[in-house]
Amino acid sequence: MTELEQKFINARRQAIALDYANLNDMQQQGTMATEGPLLLLAGAGSGKTTVLIHRVANLLRYGRGSDTDEIPIPISEDEVAFLEAYAAQPTPEQRPLMQYLCAVEPARPWEVLAITFTNKAANELKERLERMLGEEARDVWASTFHSACVRILRRDIEQIGYSRDFTIYDTDDSKRVVKDCLKELELDEKTFPVREIVSVISRAKDEMLLPEDFRAYWEKNNDWRKIRIAKVYSLYTKKLRDANALDFDDIILLTVQLLQSRPEVREYYQRKFRYVLVDEYQDTNHLQYLLTSLLAGGYRNICVVGDDDQSIYRFRGANIENILSFEKEYRGARVIRLEQNYRSTQN
């Protein structure tokens, strides 16, 4: 690398960093480290949502410009001098040229998948991105796990034997179907409570245990009660399939099965999503871990944000091991800790 090229790269990073001058050092690093696997460890009040929003904005404005030594355009001393002057005293008139010089393959909005755990968090992400970037932010895939999977299934579920107009069953629907199954199998609800069976089926799906696998496991262990629950699980699955219906767990399970079994579908989404971001990663369960691994398997540009000290979703099968083993799963991953607590500071 020539001295001129090094000066340009340094000036480019300084110019981009001005966009995030209101962030602290670690937040700025989390925003500008765009390439490869990244683990952001962030407790409550550390500004992680702000980092996620700035990170997406950075990807759309500059692509990998803040995290590469690549120079895709011819440069001279003039470009270096311009960026150095901009970094010292920026003006609005200079901004278009600055963005042109600093951008390296900026991501298109639909190439960014940002997954959150709640609709409220997803909507907040969309609203704040739109305020920052305008209408183009609407095309970012900012959604919950279930919403993202429904979009994928509406496009491709026919490849695994369902029709695209599938119905989604809520918890009450699932309980109703389980009740019907118990009645058909002549099993007493007092011995086999509906809520318990719904929970057992949900956990089985999270572990990708299909009815036949579930039954074989408990037959091997000679568990009379679980063998009967396996019969309920099998009949429950048949009833949903006959109705072209999915329960909440099926939405993610079938998406994972689709991506695993159909290489062309998997490759389509791996090409589509250049950048995958996952919030509250410590709360992901086994299926959600598999899903994000599959979707990020093309570019490996996956950024996960989480707190390694808490897991409020443990009752839903959350596996905190997903965050603790991230560096082992993704060789070469960078780890950044957002340790300053702004809520405490404000108090």
Model-derived segments and spans:
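P-loop NTPase Walker
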Residues: 1-163, 168, 267, 321, ...
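Conserved helicase/translocase P-loop NTPase motor core
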Residues: 22, 89-98, 145-149, 227-275, ...
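ATP-hydrolysis module of ASCE/P-loop NTPase motor domains
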Residues: 30, 34, 117, 136-140, ...
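Short glycine-/polar-rich loops that comprise or flank the Walker A/P-loop
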Residues: 36, 107-111, 136-139, 298-301, ...
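Residues immediately C-terminal
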Residues: 58, 280-286, 310-314
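Conserved coupling/interface region of RecA-like P-loop/ASCE motor cores
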Residues: 119, 180, 310-347
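Walker B catalytic acidic pair
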Residues: 272, 280, 307
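Short, conserved "post-DEAD/DEAH" coupling segment immediately C-terminal to helicase motif II
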Residues: 286-301, 318-325
